[in-house]
A protein has these predicted regions:
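Cytoplasmic helix-loop-helix junction between adjacent transmembrane helices
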Residues: 105-145
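Extracytoplasmic
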Residues: 11-45
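Helix-loop-helix hairpin linking two adjacent transmembrane segments in secondary transporters
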Residues: 143-193
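Short hydrophobic/alpha-helical segments at membrane-entry points of transmembrane helices
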Residues: 98-106, 232
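Helix-breaking motifs and short loop linkers at transmembrane-helix boundaries and internal kinks
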Residues: 42, 74, 95-101, 112, ...
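Residue-level signature of mid-helix packing/kink "hotspots" within the transmembrane helices
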Residues: 28, 56-64, 114, 148-149
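Conserved MFS/SLC helix-loop-helix module at the cytosolic interface between two early adjacent transmembrane helices
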Residues: 61-100
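Juxtamembrane intracellular "pre-TM" segments in multi-pass secondary transporters
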Residues: 2-5, 189-232
Length: 232
């Protein structure tokens, strides 16, 4: 008798939707709270620009290394570590006491958050059937941008109740909770998850690119260069 198909992959999508929301909450709230931050820390507009740039530079510098790390170590371990890391520095943002401390904290925050989107992309590639990836990623991006649009209102509401410092603390907690839940429940491949039925597993792996395929990673580029012919 055929096994009943499970839908464990949709729980993975739920985790990714939650993580997308966390990334936007943690990265976007600082712009909304910048007037209060500038006033309390005595910062100029130029100094706030440097703080924003510190995040962007770290994000760009660490995105490829953390993506490589996720490819080698798997997203269970990597996302657990980087989400806990950047959530800790989201909380630490509320404890900043000067321009220098804020600059360092936001740089380290950006270094952690850099791996979020590559990690999520790899998770989708391992868990979502090719026939569903477009729809799932469309839902994911839409939800993430809705959160981005709501973040200023949420940040202002929370800051109005408890100030900008506690807002960063409150925004950092969901990421810590997410990292713990992710590490306990998730597995890098559906083959490793006890709750996935054979029917669901067959659907997920059908048509999935094999890691040994000629268009996988460096093997593709080596073959491309090997067979390259000069133009005449």
């Amino acid at each position: 008798m055929p096994s009943r198909p499970t839908r464990v992959r949709y729980r993975v999508v739920g985790f990714m939707l939650a993580l997308g929301a966390v990334t936007y909450l943690d990265r976007a709230c600082i712009a909304t709270l910048s007037p209060d931050i500038r006033r309390d820390l005595g910062l100029s507009k130029d100094q706030m620009s440097w703080i924003y740039s510190a995040f962007a530079i770290a994000y760009a510098a660490f995105e490829i290394p953390t993506a490589w790390w996720a490819d080698r170590m798997g997203t269970r371990r990597v996302l657990t570590r980087i989400v806990a890391w950047w959530s800790a520095f989201t909380i630490a943002t509320g404890a900043a006491w000067s321009f220098g401390s804020m600059l360092v904290i936001r740089f380290l925050f950006g270094a952690g958050e850099a791996g979020a989107w590559p990690g999520m992309a790899r998770t989708f590639s391992r868990w979502i059937p090719r026939s569903e990836r477009g729809t799932v990623q469309g839902i994911f991006f839409a939800a993430a941008h809705v959160t981005g649009g709501l973040t200023p209102m949420i940040a202002l509401a929370v800051a109005g109740l408890c100030g900008w410092r506690w807002t960063f603390v409150i925004f950092g907690v969901p990421g810590i909770v997410w990292a713990i839940a992710w590490h306990r429940w998730f597995r890098d491949d559906p083959e490793q998850h006890a709750a996935v039925s054979p029917a669901e597993l067959a659907k997920i792996v059908a048509g999935r690119e094999q890691s040994s395929g000629q268009h996988e990673g460096w093997a593709y580029w080596r073959q491309l260069l090997r067979h390259r012919r000069p133009a005449h």
